[in-house]
Amino acid sequence: MKIMVINGPNLNLLGIREKEIYGAKDFNQVIDYIKEEGKELGLEVNCFQSNIEGEIINFIHNAYFEKYDGIIINPGAYTHYSIAIYDALKGVEIPTVEVHLSNIHKREEFRHKSVTAPACIGQISGFGEYGYIMAMNALKNKIK
């Protein structure tokens, strides 16, 4: 089973940015953790990151053309306003789980709404990097 993990804006700053919210592990440590756990689950996991909305949309399109079985996406701040990412996810019809390291519902009011989550089979929020592992398990069980 082939899974694409897409990380949006500022996630490359993990370990630097607001450690009390996002944790002390740097981006590469989190990616290594995701890949190791994916391998344990018998998944082929490829990870991508961009601060640019159009590149994120291209990753989603590529997931379709490269025949990925599932997508895990942390759209970062695009969560709250990117209709374009929502449309891309709806357009490819690949089972997708939205992940957030922090609990977006316990943060600033503007972070409470996700416009991208309705295009996903589920949302995992507030479990740190373990949320990606939860998402991989969810996809593995959903896709079978």
UniProtKB/Swiss-Prot annotation:
Gene Ontology molecular function, alphabetical: 3-dehydroquinate dehydratase activity
Binding residues for substrate: 74, 80, 87, 101-102, 111
InterPro entries for the chain: DHquinase_II, DHquinase_II_CS, DHquinase_II_sf
EC number: 4.2.1.10
Keyword Amino-acid biosynthesis: yes
GO BP annotations listed: amino acid biosynthetic process; aromatic amino acid family biosynthetic process; chorismate biosynthetic process; quinate catabolic process
Pathway involvement of the protein, from the record: Metabolic intermediate biosynthesis; chorismate biosynthesis; chorismate from D-erythrose 4-phosphate and phosphoenolpyruvate: step 3/7
Site (Transition state stabilizer): 17
Enzyme active site: 22, 100
Keywords: Amino-acid biosynthesis, Aromatic amino acid biosynthesis, Lyase
UniProt xrefs under CDD domains: DHQase_II
One Pfam family it belongs to: DHquinase_II
Reactions accelerated catalytically: 3-dehydroquinate = 3-dehydroshikimate + H2O
Top enzyme category: lyase
SUPFAM superfamilies: Type II 3-dehydroquinate dehydratase
Entry's family note: Belongs to the type-II 3-dehydroquinase family.
Assembly and interaction partners: Homododecamer.
Record function comment: Catalyzes a trans-dehydration via an enolate intermediate.
PANTHER family named in the record: CATABOLIC 3-DEHYDROQUINASE
UniProt-recorded name of the protein: 3-dehydroquinate dehydratase
Source organism (scientific name): Clostridium perfringens (strain ATCC 13124 / DSM 756 / JCM 1290 / NCIMB 6125 / NCTC 8237 / Type A)
